[in-house]
A protein has these predicted regions:
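N-terminal "domain-start" segment that seeds a small globular fold
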Residues: 1-21, 133-135
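Short loop/turn microsegments at loop-to-beta-strand junctions
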Residues: 5-6, 27-28, 108-109
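Hydrophobic beta-strand positions
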Residues: 9-10, 32, 113
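Short acidic-hydrophobic, aromatic-tinged amphipathic segments that line or gate anion-handling sites
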Residues: 10-11, 88-93, 124-125
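Short active-site neighborhood of thiol/selenol oxidoreductases, capturing the structured segment around
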Residues: 18-47, 63-65
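Structural microenvironment flanking redox-active thiols in thiol-disulfide oxidoreductases
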Residues: 41-81, 95-101
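Short, internal strand/loop/helix patches
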Residues: 77-112, 116-117
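Thiol-/selenol-based redox modules, centered on thioredoxin-like
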Residues: 113-140
Length: 140
């Protein structure tokens, strides 16, 4: 905790790419998820239903990067409409995050909360309530 997160490149459905460090927001929530994961769907719904997270997203203080770390893009594309349009919905081309061990994804889903400078505030989180609790205690 408190250490800089590893940067990585992500790819959007359009083919455009971006980097984690290119995301400009006070906080970034990296949500590692899979299309056919029931727990991932539950967490996505909890993020959407959270008044705190929704307000922070609306105000531009929180950016959610929903990242698919695997290689079956057919499943990812079919699932894309379920991800809120206010989020960055992306995949890891070539599964570099796993192959290069940039993040130790013990389980999916997993959330990493990062501050403006991409320092890790929470890692391997799977409870939205914990993310809310942390954000509620951070300087705005």
């Amino acid at each position: 905790m408190g250490l800089p997160a590893n940067d990585f490149r992500y790819t959007l459905a359009s083919g455009r790419t971006g980097t984690l460090y290119g995301i400009r927001a006070n906080y970034t929530l990296v949500f590692f998820n899979n299309p056919d994961c029931g727990m991932c769907e539950r967490i996505r719904a909890e993020i959407v239903a959270s008044p705190l997270l929704s307000e922070m997203i609306r105000a531009g203080r929180l950016e959610v990067l929903a990242l698919y770390p695997d290689e079956d893009l057919t499943a990812w594309r079919a699932h894309a409409p379920q991800v809120p349009s206010s989020w960055i919905n992306a995949y890891d081309a070539g599964a570099r995050i796993s192959k290069e061990e940039l993040y130790d994804l013990k389980a999916i889903p997993s959330m990493y909360l990062l501050d403006r400078d991409k320092r890790v505030l929470a890692k391997d989180a799977f409870e939205v309530g914990y993310i809310e609790w942390l954000l509620d205690r951070q300087p705005q």
